[in-house]
């Protein structure tokens, strides 16, 4: 019973506590309801404060990050592999054509002695011996050309003598041969026993013949002996002529020798007693070709032979005596005269000749030829001068397929066959084919055409030249073999059927005419593909290389009125093809239609 009463008391107390709790919770709820308006009133201010606080903290964080970045090394971002792309380039600056105001050439090459091509003087005013003057007058020489008027006083003894070697640049046909032959003959006094004292080296047999004729003319009556040496004569025959005692007693028999470089080397190597120990004059004509081509290394052989003159044995007892005393042997170097229409200014090539106190003489070029208007020095190391009486023309031949017809039209309508004509081709085969083709196209020309080609024997070339001089033929078709040393008097026209391969070749080709002050014309057949090169390099004279008196003219004509000739041209080509296949047998000449 007691336990039951206790449990009831506990329940009552719990119930009372529950009631008290409810009563106490009601006033609390009332207080919270009173605080709500106050909190809402300051919520905006608090939110602004919180945002401002966060912004300040964020700014501090950023500043601390910057400080860390400045103290710590930066880490490169990883490079992503991509394809190659061109880098952007700035625009190229415009190029300016600047000419150097200085020359790398030695002074004697950079500042030559220049003379006008129009200069003329009487031979009597040049200091030539009276005996030589009579010889010249008897042969019709009374007035000296520009190169002779300038060079002869420099080589002869006198107030204007140049004590050294000479290099001479003058146009072909300007009289260079006589300009060195006259002083050479004057300087070499006759001796009781002939000695080789004058040596003239030229590249071709035609030039050997021309120089020998000039030497024999000037040496007439002087007692000087003149000989020549070329490759078409057996060396034993020349040995008997120049050294009659070749086997038992070797002694020279000539005072002046004109030779080609190859034959000179043969004599120096294989002819006993043939030496240059007494040489006083060494003349090198057409020097550009002789120095550009080796010709059995002739320069080295000649210089070695000249060095042998300084050996004690060359002076006999006196030489050995001086050598024993330790005294040097003095040997005077021969005077060297170097000539060319296209004189090289290559210092290396000229140095191989061991020139002493050299002077360059340029004929036919104005003083300002190597300078432009701004005062710069022209970059060209070569200067070419054409004869002042030469007229130049170009003939357009289209694509070149009918070039023989253009040549025929030029010969018949513009040049006339009564004049003398020299036609240049690029090869011997081309020259032979062209001569045959012209004969087939115009049968009347067959007896008036001759050829000078490399395959010709010397006798055949001589026959052609003899027929030309006698007037039997008026047209010669030749290769560049005839561009040097061939002196065809009264030649009025040169035709370049094939465009020359270089400026030098062109200068030597057209130099066959307008010689010795006579008038002459040069014609060049130019196809479309060749026009640009010819115009820039030759007609306009690239870099001022060519000095000419008149501009190159242009000639154009059509083949409209040549229907019959065109028909013969087609049949002639067929016939020419058959002749080539059958071994070149000449068919009968076709009759004119």
Swiss-Prot record:
Query: Which positions does the motif Q motif occupy?
Result: 121-149
- Biased composition range(s): Low complexity: 84-93
Composition skew (Basic and acidic residues), residue ranges? 48-68
Catalysed reaction(s)? Answer: ATP + H2O = ADP + phosphate + H(+)
Q: Which residues form a coiled coil?
A: none
Q: Which PROSITE patterns match?
A: DEAD_ATP_HELICASE (PS00039), HELICASE_ATP_BIND_1 (PS51192), HELICASE_CTER (PS51194), Q_MOTIF (PS51195)
Q: Which UniProt keywords apply?
A: ATP-binding, Helicase, Hydrolase, Nucleotide-binding, Nucleus, Ribosome biogenesis, RNA-binding, rRNA processing
Q: Does the keyword Kinase apply?
A: no
Which molecular function term from Gene Ontology is one that the record holds? ATP binding
Show the InterPro entries listed in the entry. Answer: DEAD/DEAH_box_helicase_dom (IPR011545), Helicase_ATP-bd (IPR014001), Helicase_C-like (IPR001650), P-loop_NTPase (IPR027417), RNA-helicase_DEAD-box_CS (IPR000629), RNA_helicase_DEAD_Q_motif (IPR014014)
Please report, in chain numbering, the residue ranges of the motif DEAD box: 285-288
- Residues forming the Helicase ATP-binding domain are 157-361
Give GO cellular component annotations, separated by semicolons.
nucleolus
Cystine connections: none
EC numbers, comma separated: 3.6.4.13
- Give the region (Disordered) as residue ranges: 1-103
Instruction: Give all residue intervals belonging to the Helicase C-terminal domain.
Output: 407-563
| Localization per record | Nucleus, Nucleolus
Family designation: Belongs to the DEAD box helicase family. DDX51/DBP6 subfamily.
Comment block on domains = The Q motif is unique to and characteristic of the DEAD box family of RNA helicases and controls ATP binding and hydrolysis.
PANTHER family xref list:
RNA HELICASE (PTHR24031)
The record's note on quaternary structure and interaction partners says: Associated with pre-ribosomal particles.
Q: What does this protein do?
A: ATP-binding RNA helicase involved in the biogenesis of 60S ribosomal subunits and is required for the normal formation of 25S and 5.8S rRNAs.
Q: What is this protein called?
A: ATP-dependent RNA helicase dbp6
Q: Which organism is it from?
A: Aspergillus niger (strain ATCC MYA-4892 / CBS 513.88 / FGSC A1513)
Q: What is the lineage of its organism?
A: Eukaryota, Fungi, Dikarya, Ascomycota, Pezizomycotina
